[in-house]
């Protein structure tokens, strides 16, 4: 919103300069976006009168004038403006004057005729872009007066950003109220003398939508001169607020809008058939707007109609068929309170955003309509003449907004502000804000003023008291609290440490939605019931996730569709599993999951182009598990999972309890999700891993290690992990390392069997092992494998 600083100072004039005023307004919560002078920098321009005006003898478009500027003689000035005429009061730049752009006025000859100055237009003085003619001043403008003084051009336009909750500041009166409160000054409102009815003319008014229009005032004014010029003082105030003068009737309604914040509209009374009906539009009803466009109305749009047709969109835009024109003699002034909910969104639906809709959407003072009607009537009659009829008031008290009664407690005020403000000061602030205040013991009862819709709860009053008291006046006090060192168990494994490891391995962390597409989730977890949202964002986001895989796989598809074929991502977050034994019937588990697909390495001339496989992901997962210190207790077991490839997946067990899965996505699921190529996933229940085993210091043997290799033939269904585990168990203290380095199937090995080549590392911490001891330990391992797995040594 833009307004003139001088106009504001007519209401309240604090003894501070423009910069301090702008800062004060900003600190009050109305952010000042800019302060600009209303005119360019110039001097030497005075009010003059054109005494004579004749045609230039040598130029058809020029005139030779004699101008009285209050000196001892008339000035000869050549002028090319089409509106220059005898008797006109004008702005005269005399010799020696300097206009904007450092343009100096000198004596000159134009087409042979002397010119001792210049008759100025608004654009030449940097006041506006209007360069259609010279400035026409009122006939009573005092000759010789400095034009800056006469037009009050030592003024600024202040532009503020008004937040949606402060609709009361969409008029000069609202800003003035705040400035008056902040400076503890009285508000000087212009005297609004009621205009008594001098005629009996009225129009019948019916309000069929009282919820949308709780109050509607109408008044007939007859015999106006719509062609009467708008006074220069009003034009200037409108211009400085960014509004162009149109005609006297429209200018008056715009003036009241800017001054009081109350939108108004004027209908041509003679074009209204029957009377006024305030109703909701009929489905498909049309209205030709003032700009000539046709709007197709919806049934939820409020309209002002006569007995035959819609005349205007209520609170938004007028209609062409009832608008004021050059032939208008009788008008109906409308001043109403429309409910914000009945206006919100309707203007945007038709590509409109008007000053009226901007205010009605945020809320207009429901007690303002009488004052605005009297103000507009007085201005209209003073400018255009005419006679006013009685004010017709249709009010539905039941649907008018009620003023909120709020209790402010001393304890709440002190706690939220952190500073004690004296009781009498709090009372004074609330009363200056317009509240009706009743003091109690350690509390205040405040009835909010009608113009403050945003005062509804106790915190609103706390904010107002702090704002008016001044945030800068509240002392800075450091927070004081006892500092207690938190206990930290060495066994606690931070999830951040795991994320860092995965980052180092080339994974990127992602965060996906907790609500997913139930159809996709059923593909991954067929037959498992999920928690459905009663009011989802969309059908595709209507179920709470049972695992992190749903979001991660969708992220892979998203990236593959954008030519990102090598993907390595992970996520930590909650899954939501229905469980009748859990609180509220839902169990929330913290999970860690990851996905890889594409090439094993980034593209490089010296690296083979190989696709990731099961063992790539299993290796990364083992690195994570190694951080827990429990890797030796983890087992990977072949176990079916409907989302995973039956031959390339495993369940992950810790001390006999399943804690997750790892494997290749099932080919059928891969096809349904449009995954491009082999995709591998893992998921772990993090809470079952977070309690790590603290590493224990062990003595490093100074004696040589010995390696012995054996190859055993076992049945195809015997897991290699069980073979390695048995060797570790049998070897006790001497076997310090067991590793599978080859798997063979083929010639020499019966069908249904496989050959596992295993290396045994033997070492003692106190002595060098003898060959006989080594051989005995190896034999013991072989014997144990024969007994448990029916293994045989391969020749």
Curated annotation (Swiss-Prot):
The keyword RNA-binding applies. Its EC number is 6.1.1.20. It is found in: Cytoplasm. Keywords: Aminoacyl-tRNA synthetase, ATP-binding, Cytoplasm, Ligase, Magnesium, Metal-binding, Nucleotide-binding, Protein biosynthesis, RNA-binding, tRNA-binding. It catalyses: tRNA(Phe) + L-phenylalanine + ATP = L-phenylalanyl-tRNA(Phe) + AMP + diphosphate + H(+). Residues 39-148 form the tRNA-binding domain. Residues 401-476 form the B5 domain. Binds 2 magnesium ions per tetramer. SMART domains: B3_4 (SM00873), B5 (SM00874), FDX-ACB (SM00896). One of its GO terms (biological process) is phenylalanyl-tRNA aminoacylation. Its cofactor is Mg(2+). Residues 701-794 form the FDX-ACB domain. The keyword Nucleotide-binding applies. Its main location: cytoplasm. One of its GO terms (cellular component) is phenylalanine-tRNA ligase complex. Mg(2+) binds at residues 454, 460, 463-464. It comes from the Bacteria. GO terms for molecular function: ATP binding; magnesium ion binding; phenylalanine-tRNA ligase activity; tRNA binding. Belongs to the phenylalanyl-tRNA synthetase beta subunit family. Type 1 subfamily. Tetramer of two alpha and two beta subunits. HAMAP family: Phe_tRNA_synth_beta1 (MF_00283). This is Phenylalanine--tRNA ligase beta subunit. It comes from Escherichia coli O157:H7.
């Amino acid at each position: 919103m833009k307004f003139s600083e001088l106009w504001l100072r007519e209401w309240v004039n604090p003894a501070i300069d423009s910069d301090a005023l702008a800062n004060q307004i900003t600190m009050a919560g109305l952010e000042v976006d800019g302060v600009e002078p209303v005119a360019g920098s110039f001097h030497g321009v005075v009010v003059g009168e054109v005494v004579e005006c004749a045609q230039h003898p040598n130029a058809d478009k020029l005139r030779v004038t004699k101008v009285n500027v209050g000196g001892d003689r008339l000035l000869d000035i050549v002028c090319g403006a089409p509106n220059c005429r005898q008797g006109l009061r004008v702005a005269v730049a005399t010799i020696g004057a300097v206009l904007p752009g450092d343009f100096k006025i000198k004596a000159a000859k134009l087409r042979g005729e002397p010119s001792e100055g210049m008759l100025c237009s608004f654009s030449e003085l940097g006041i506006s872009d209007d360069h259609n003619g010279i400035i026409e001043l009122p006939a009573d403008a005092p000759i010789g007066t400095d034009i800056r003084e006469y037009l009050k051009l030592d003024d600024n336009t202040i532009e503020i950003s008004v937040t949606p909750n402060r609709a009361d500041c969409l008029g000069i009166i609202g800003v003035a109220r705040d400035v008056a409160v902040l400076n503890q000054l009285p508000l000087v409102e212009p005297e609004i003398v009621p205009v008594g009815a001098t005629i009996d003319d009225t129009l019948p008014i019916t309000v069929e939508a009282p919820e949308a229009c709780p109050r509607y005032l109408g008044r007939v004014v007859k015999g106006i001169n719509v062609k009467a010029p708008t006074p220069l003082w009003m034009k200037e105030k409108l211009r400085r607020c960014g509004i162009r003068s149109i005609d006297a009737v429209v200018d008056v309604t715009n003036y009241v809008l800017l001054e009081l914040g109350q939108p108004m509209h004027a209908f041509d009374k003679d074009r209204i058939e029957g009377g006024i009906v305030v109703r909701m539009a009929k489905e498909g009803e049309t209205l030709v707007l003032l700009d000539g466009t046709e709007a197709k109305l919806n049934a939820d749009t409020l309209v002002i109609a006569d007995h035959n047709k819609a005349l205007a969109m209520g609170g938004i835009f007028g209609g062409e068929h009832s608008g004021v024109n050059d032939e208008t003699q009788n008008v109906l002034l409308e001043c109403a309170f429309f409910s914000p909910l009945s206006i919100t969104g309707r203007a945007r639906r038709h590509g409109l955003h008007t000053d009226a809709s901007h205010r009605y959407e945020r809320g207009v003072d429901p007690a303002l309509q009488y004052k605005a009607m009297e103000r507009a009537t007085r201005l209209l009659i003073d400018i255009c003449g005419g006679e006013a009829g009685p004010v017709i008031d249709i009010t539905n008290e039941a649907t008018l907004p009620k003023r909120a009664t709020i209790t402010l407690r001393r304890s709440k005020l002190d706690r939220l502000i952190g500073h004690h403000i004296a009781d009498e000061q709090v009372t004074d602030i609330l009363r200056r804000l317009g509240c009706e205040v009743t003091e109690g013991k350690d509390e205040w009862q405040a009835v909010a003023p009608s113009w403050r819709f945003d005062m509804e709860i106790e915190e609103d009053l706390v904010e107002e008291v702090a704002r008016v008291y001044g945030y800068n006046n509240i002392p800075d006090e450091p927070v004081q609290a006892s500092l207690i060192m938190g206990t930290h168990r060495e066994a606690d494994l931070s999830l951040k440490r795991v994320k860092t490891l995965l980052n180092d391995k080339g994974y990127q962390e992602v965060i996906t939605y907790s609500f997913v597409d139930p159809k996709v989730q059923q593909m991954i977890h067929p037959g498992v019931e999920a928690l459905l949202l009663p009011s989802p964002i969309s059908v595709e986001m209507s179920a709470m996730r049972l695992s992190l895989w749903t979001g991660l796989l969708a992220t892979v598809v998203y990236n593959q569709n954008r030519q990102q074929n090598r993907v390595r991502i992970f996520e930590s977050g909650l899954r939501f599993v229905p469980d009748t034994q859990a609180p509220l019937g839902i169990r929330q588990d913290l999970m860690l999951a990851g996905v890889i697909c594409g090439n094993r390495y980034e593209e490089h001339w010296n690296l083979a182009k190989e696709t990731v496989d099961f063992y790539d992901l299993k290796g990364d997962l083992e690195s994570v598990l190694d951080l827990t210190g429990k890797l030796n207790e983890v087992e990977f077991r072949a176990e079916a999972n409907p989302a995973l490839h039956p031959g390339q997946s495993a369940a992950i067990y810790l001390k006999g309890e399943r804690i997750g899965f790892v494997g290749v996505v099932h080919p059928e699921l891969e096809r349904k999700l449009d995954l491009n190529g082999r995709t591998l996933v893992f998921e772990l229940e993090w809470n079952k891993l977070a309690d790590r085993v603290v590493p224990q210091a062990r003595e490093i043997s100074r004696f040589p290690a010995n390696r012995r290799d054996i190859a055993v033939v076992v049945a195809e269904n015997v897991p290699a992990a069980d073979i390695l585990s048995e060797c570790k168990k049998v070897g006790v203290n001497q076997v310090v390392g067991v590793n599978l380095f080859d798997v063979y199937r083929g010639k020499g090995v019966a069908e249904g069997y496989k050959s596992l080549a295993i290396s045994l590392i033997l070492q003692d911490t106190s002595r060098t092992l003898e060959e006989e001891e080594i051989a005995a330990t190896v034999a013991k391992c072989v014997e144990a494998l024969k007994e448990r797995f029916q293994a045989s040594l391969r020749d």
